Regions:
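Short alpha-helix in the alpha/beta-hydrolase fold that links the catalytic acid
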Residues: 98-105
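Conserved beta-strand scaffold positions in the cores of enzyme catalytic domains, especially
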Residues: 41, 86-88, 112-114
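Serine-dependent carboxylesterase/thioesterase catalytic core
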Residues: 1-85, 170-172
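Alpha/beta-hydrolase-fold serine-hydrolase catalytic core, especially in secreted/extracellular enzymes
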Residues: 141-172
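Post-His helix in hydrolase/transferase enzymes
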Residues: 123-136
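Histidine-bearing beta->alpha loop at or near hydrolase active sites
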Residues: 116-122
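Acidic catalytic loop of the alpha/beta-hydrolase fold
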Residues: 92-97, 120
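Short beta-strand/loop motif that positions the catalytic acidic residue
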Residues: 82, 88-90, 94
Length: 172
C-alpha cells in the first residue's frame, strides 16, 4: 500500500491500474478496498470470479494442476463488482483461464471487451493494447464504453456472443 500511496501522491490523485492474469485480480482488489486511490481498473485474462478454483482453468491446465497438487486448499473469490470504472479484456481462446470466469456484469462504468488470442499473449495483443490505451486516455469523470475504430472492428468479436458469466451461488 505504500507504493500505491506514493503513486497517488506523484499523480496528484487516483491512478489507473492495469493487470494481467493475477495482476488483474490485484488491480481489482486494490480498487475494491481503496477506491479513493484508484481511478479505474483494467484486467486482462483475469479470473475475477471463481466459485471453484478448478472450474476457471482450461482442461489442460486443470489436469497439470491436479498432477502437481496445486489446487488443494484454494478458495473461490468474487471481484466482479468494484466501486470504480472497470474494463475486463478476455479471450475465448485464452487456453489458461475459462473466459466466463473473467466476465463482470456490464453497467454504466463496467464493460467486457473480447479479443482474439491466447492468455500468454494478451499483453502484446494489438487489439488488447489498443483497448487499454483507449481506456487510459479517457478524462476523469468522462468514462464511456469502448468503441473500436471502424477499421479495427474486426479485431473485437461480437459482444452479444459473449459467454455467460459464472453464476453466483444461491443466497449471494
Amino acid at each position: 500500500l505504500r507504493r500505491l500511496d506514493q503513486l497517488v501522491q506523484q499523480n496528484g490523485g487516483p491512478i489507473d491500474i492495469v493487470g494481467w492474469s493475477l495482476g488483474g485480480i490485484m488491480a481489482r482488489l486494490l480498487a475494491l478496498h481503496h477506491p479513493d486511490r484508484v481511478r479505474q481498473a483494467i484486467s486482462l485474462g483475469s479470473p475475477i470470479r471463481v466459485e471453484d478454483p478448478e472450474a476457471n482453468l482450461s482442461e489442460s491446465v486443470r489436469r497439470l494442476s491436479q498432477l502437481a497438487g496445486l489446487q488443494r486448499g484454494r478458495r473461490g473469490h468474487d471481484l466482479t463488482e468494484i466501486p470504480v470504472p472497470s474494463t475486463v479484456i478476455y479471450s475465448r481462446q485464452d487456453g489458461v483461464v475459462a473466459p466466463a470466469s473473467c466476465l463482470q456484469p456490464v453497467g454504466p462504468t463496467a464493460e467486457n471487451i473480447e479479443v482474439r488470442g491466447a492468455h500468454i499473449g494478451l499483453g502484446h495483443n494489438p487489439a488488447a493494447v489498443w483497448a487499454v490505451a483507449d481506456r487510459l486516455a479517457q478524462r476523469d469523470g468522462e468514462w464511456a464504453p469502448f468503441e473500436p475504430p471502424s477499421a479495427m472492428a474486426w479485431c473485437y468479436p461480437d459482444p452479444d456472443r459473449a459467454p455467460e458469466p459464472v453464476p453466483r451461488p444461491a443466497g449471494t
